[in-house]
């Protein structure tokens, strides 16, 4: 029932692809994507340190064998799902510490041994040799949220494409936090780690970032982070602890944020969309 509710909301918004991060998903979700014609990036849980004080990869035989097993199981269990278009090998790894590059090469070869028909991909958040190992590469970018402005996304994409035109590059994550209870009349960039996560900044962020992505046909795909607010135990930001509020829909699936309707207007070609942004701002003078 929960998977069906999530799928209905995504179809309502008009998505045509999803990244099922960062781990194997329930079989029923793959059945729903098959039925709905949504393209899927499926991946194993080989994840860098993120917000935790760790290095992500530890060069131990047990860890590497576990990764091999999970990749083989992911591919063999889901090989016949037509919605799956690529296999993801890692998310936000670092070359510092134990260098994961030889192991990623091994996983890439293993994926092609198991499936000769689908490309491999990965989600990076830095430069270096990590970005030249899989068939496709995508970056997690938060230009205009974790500092900088949306314009830096344009600079990054253009510069990377100019230097490495051979790279098949995409955007694996982009997003900004928002609380439906935080409303402001002015457009002011908030502090990501702070309490105040105004909804209108998230809307602005997505309008500007999507414009940049849409204008660059060399970007093979892009994935909003995230469709729904979700639990994240280490986070102490926004209006609730333990929640990542970058979703376009609230955690309980009850409220579609303004940015949801922006994408619906751009992506859903089957129905017209009229939505008044900022309607939840009860303190406005207009």
What kind of feature is each model-predicted range?
Residues 1-286:
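Extended substrate-binding grooves/exosites of carbohydrate-active enzymes
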